């Protein structure tokens, strides 16, 4: 693969969305990092120092179908599942500034309150994170409870994790009958006032609560859970699925008058998007 000289001074990461199951990654004959174990979730390596700018670069991936980790092998290989191996989800590169948002988690409740936990890479002191929300349906900006279009979080320390909170007005909560969705945008502004990174994700404002001897509540209303178990599986692709297959499965489940799905492991992101769009609640059995 080609790496242009214009990438100089930036961080380059390679992402794997799913490799079954132990993976050793080499860039130009050198290890990208420790062997990755676990076949169902995304992982990445910072390969900046291994690249040859302005030249051809070589990626090698060595995959073992059986894991050297006994616990992982028991979870992935000893159950009554079809056994597959290889790179079965997308692989891509991301070019990032030296200081960037590495990972973030959003929690948006049905009253419009939003909390963001953002992991920073590099010393972000002096930067700002700007958060905004718009409707997925019509693209209209959603105003905060004090009438602003954004919330600005100044980073006054060198802590890796930055916590941001805000409240948005007049939101329509997500529910199984009305799966209303929004887009949250996080922008990173450097001390010179330039936006150096933008991240977006779809969100639903919802509150899920569990009460012993009572059940599950969604947005303060008891939810009668009617669901099924589902494997990520394609007749002609094995573990490699598609957005079209995800939509077909989600529609079939919805047509069966169900509102919930339990997976055996993290599914493809496009299936979670379909669940969000159609009003299906989702639970993972194994986080990895």
Please state what every model-predicted region is.
Residues 25-27, 113-153:
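Beta-strand-rich binding/interaction modules
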Residues 87, 143-145, 195-200:
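Extracellular and select intracellular beta-sandwich modules with Ser/Thr-enriched
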Residues 96-99, 205-211:
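Extracellular interdomain linker/stem segments of modular secreted and single-pass surface proteins
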Residues 94, 150, 202-206:
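Short beta-strand edge segments in extracellular beta-sheet folds
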Residues 1-103, 123, 262, 267-269, ...:
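Accessory beta-strand-rich segments of carbohydrate-active enzymes
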Residues 35, 39-44, 70-72, 84, ...:
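Active-site mouth of glycoside hydrolases
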Residues 41-45, 151, 158-164:
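Short strand-edge motifs at loop-to-beta-strand transitions and within beta-strands
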